[in-house]
């Protein structure tokens, strides 16, 4: 004969569940990075941009075939994802009559590669809609050439997405940085830092900025900067995930309630 749990036992279990739920940090605002966070930038943008740059380098006088130069750029990129020395390494390998002209051509082509059709990660839209339905305020911050980033956002259909409250563009001239965008979002929403979650892929960028401001940080470890290791505790996210859809299953309470 099965014994029914006592009222005391049932109440104790409910109390334990309540205490467990209360330990989950409340999140009222989520800030997403764009590249390699909401869509596959490495596959859809970075590799085509390197091919575009390889074509420009050859046109400017680099001595090599398109396939050779493209593969050399990818090898150099994996060794130096911050692009500090990639052009000089490729030029040194192949040779050119005017290295400066080739370097300028590569830089301009890489950062101005035409934006074609782009597709969000499969779980991105369902996550945005889940957060919106939960009453969470949603923002996007993205870094790079502003015109190019705006074209990416439009190609992904995010300018028409009602779940997104506002998109901030951090530029290369650093007139707007991700940290300043985070500060502005906090000031405009009035939401405490410990109720804001930042989701991104770069330890030295949005993760460091979020941690420095006392916000929660989740790193999506894939794409262009997947191999980058945190330099210190300030670049170490609270959680690491491999799929954007995993955000909703993390130990947070997503709600508009204070």
Predicted regions and their residues:
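An amphipathic alpha-helix signature
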Residues: 46-55, 83-88, 146, 150
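Active-site neighborhood of HAD-like aspartate-dependent phosphohydrolases
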Residues: 21-68
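Surface-exposed cleft-lining segments at the edges of enzyme active sites
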Residues: 109-117
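Asp-based, Mg2+/Mn2+-dependent phosphohydrolase catalytic module
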Residues: 2-28, 125, 129-132, 139, ...
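Small/polar loops that bind or transfer phosphate-bearing groups
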Residues: 41, 140-141
């Amino acid at each position: 004969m099965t014994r029914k749990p006592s009222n005391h036992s049932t109440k104790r279990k409910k109390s334990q569940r309540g205490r467990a739920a209360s330990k989950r940090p409340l999140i009222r605002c989520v800030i997403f990075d764009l590249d390699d966070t909401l869509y596959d930038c490495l596959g859809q943008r970075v590799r085509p941009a390197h091919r575009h740059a390889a074509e420009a380098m050859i046109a400017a006088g680099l001595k090599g075939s398109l396939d050779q130069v493209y593969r050399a750029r990818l090898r150099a990129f994996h060794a130096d994802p911050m692009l500090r020395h990639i052009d000089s390494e490729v030029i040194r390998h192949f040779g050119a009559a005017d290295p400066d002209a080739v370097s300028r051509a590569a830089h301009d082509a890489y950062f101005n590669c035409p934006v074609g059709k782009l597709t969000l990660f499969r779980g991105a839209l369902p996550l945005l809609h889940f957060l919106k339905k939960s009453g969470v305020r949603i923002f996007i911050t993205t870094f790079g050439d502003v015109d190019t980033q705006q074209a990416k956002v439009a190609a992904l259909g995010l300018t028409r997405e009602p779940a997104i409250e506002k998109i901030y563009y951090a530029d290369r001239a650093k007139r707007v940085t991700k940290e300043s965008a985070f500060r502005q979002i906090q000031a405009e929403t009035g939401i405490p830092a410990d109720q804001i979650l930042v989701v991104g892929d770069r330890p030295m960028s949005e993760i460091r900025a979020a941690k420095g401001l006392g916000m929660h940080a989740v790193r999506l470890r894939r794409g262009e900067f997947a191999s980058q290791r945190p330099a210190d505790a300030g670049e170490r996210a609270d959680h690491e995930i491999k799929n954007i859809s995993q955000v909703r299953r993390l130990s947070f309470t997503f709600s508009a309630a204070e």
